[in-house]
A protein has these predicted regions:
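Conserved ABC transporter NBD signature motif
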Residues: 73-87
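Conserved catalytic motifs of ABC-family nucleotide-binding domains
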Residues: 165
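Catalytic Walker B motif of ABC-type/P-loop ATPase nucleotide-binding domains
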Residues: 169-173
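A short, flexible loop at the N-terminus of ABC-type nucleotide-binding domains that lies
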Residues: 2-15, 21-36
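Short, charged/small-residue-rich alpha-helical element at the C-terminal edge
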Residues: 231-298
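Conserved ABC ATPase "signature" region
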Residues: 111, 115, 123-140
Length: 344
């Protein structure tokens, strides 16, 4: 859990009974892609949206971005309708596929998106320098992005989604195509942004990433949310207990087994812990870097871009209030805000 605020923070995403039905040419309902979705994401949270292909995740994201209109239900993004133009300036979005202009360089790509957000030349230059360092693409910033590997394209896409210093970040498969080093760096970046007050909606098929990062998780299937809660709530197995100690001699293990047996509690497993393959991989790569080994790809990412450091305070000052600070429990959506939108 990496959020900067508790469950009492402002509500940045609120959905109540959201449904989307796609119709044919004759307006007959054909596919109900999203069916009665209700969820709430509070400021500073990392919220995981999971589900197999065709479960309704992408359709839900498009409705949150205002690209699709819901057939039924209500949505509020940063306290406004998803179609509110001013609110879109406070949102960063990384789609599942990297849609880039192949003949622009990495620097030109970021400059283009900075111009779309009407950043002045000095702000663009400073932010681009910091973002390129942050995602490890300084050395290849003048190469056309069409020559980038998929992992490098995801890095420039992530930098693009941050150029406007968003309050809400929607990331669809951000680590797709990345090696374990790049994946670890992106996960660390997401955690840091959340601690600085950014709100992150994360979609990923890499369940380990979601478990590492997310404060709350929703699992979709058939257009509906089938389970929702914290990872601890969803994953804790109440029927088993783990005891951890230093290396235990065989004689002590036998004594422990006898004690447990007297209480009708069989000892089902005794083993030495294993490190993860990811940690071994990262250790080997870091060792090679320390020895001066070179790579032709993306380099190790740098510090978080300085202009993002004020995310919690800066965005809070410019973003509309999304809900009362103490509104409801984490699992119950504050419908007052949505009701007010309906009346407008």
């Amino acid at each position: 859990m990496v959020s900067a605020v508790g469950d009492g923070g402002a509500v940045d995403i609120a959905c109540v009974g959201v449904t989307k039905t796609f119709r044919d040419f004759w307006m007959r309902p054909r596919v109900r892609a999203v069916d009665g979705v209700t969820l709430e994401v509070r400021r500073g949270q990392v919220y995981g949206l999971l589900g197999p292909n065709g479960s309704g995740k992408s359709t839900t994201i498009k409705m949150l971005l205002g690209l699709l209109q819901p057939t039924a239900g209500r949505i509020a993004i940063l306290g406004k309708r998803p179609t509110d133009v001013a609110t879109k300036r406070l949102i960063g979005y990384l789609p599942e596929e990297s849609y880039l202009y192949r003949f622009l360089t990495g620097r030109e790509t970021l400059d283009y998106f900075g111009r779309l957000f009407r950043l002045d030349a000095r702000a663009r230059r400073e932010r681009i320098d910091m973002l390129l360092e942050m995602v490890g693409l300084e050395a290849v910033q003048h190469r056309p992005v069409g020559e980038y590997s998929k992992g490098m394209q995801r890095r420039i896409g992530l930098a693009q989604s941050l150029i406007n210093d968003p309050q809400l970040l929607i990331l669809d498969e951000p680590t797709s195509g990345m090696d374990p080093v790049g994946s670890r760096q992106i996960k660390d970046l997401i955690a840091t942004l959340a601690r600085r007050g950014k709100t992150v909606l994360l979609c990923s098929h890499l369940l380990g990433d979601v478990e590492d990062l997310c404060d709350r998780v929703a699992i979709m299937y058939g257009g509906r949310i089938r389970a929702e809660g914290t990872c601890a709530e969803l994953l804790t197995q109440e029927h088993a207990t783990i005891l951890e100690t230093a290396d235990m001699p065989a004689g002590v293990v036998a004594e422990v087994r006898e004690v447990l047996a007297r209480h009708d509690l069989p000892l089902t497993r005794v083993e030495h812990p294993r490190r993860s393959l990811e940690s071994l991989f990262l250790e080997i790569v870091e060792r090679a870097r320390a020895e001066g080994a070179q790579t032709a790809g993306a380099s190790a990412g740098g510090p978080v871009a300085g202009f993002l450091a004020a995310g919690a305070a800066g965005a809070a000052a410019t973003a509309p209030a999304a809900g009362a600070a103490g509104a409801g429990a984490a699992g119950a959506v504050d419908t007052g805000l949505l009701d007010s939108l309906t009346r407008r």
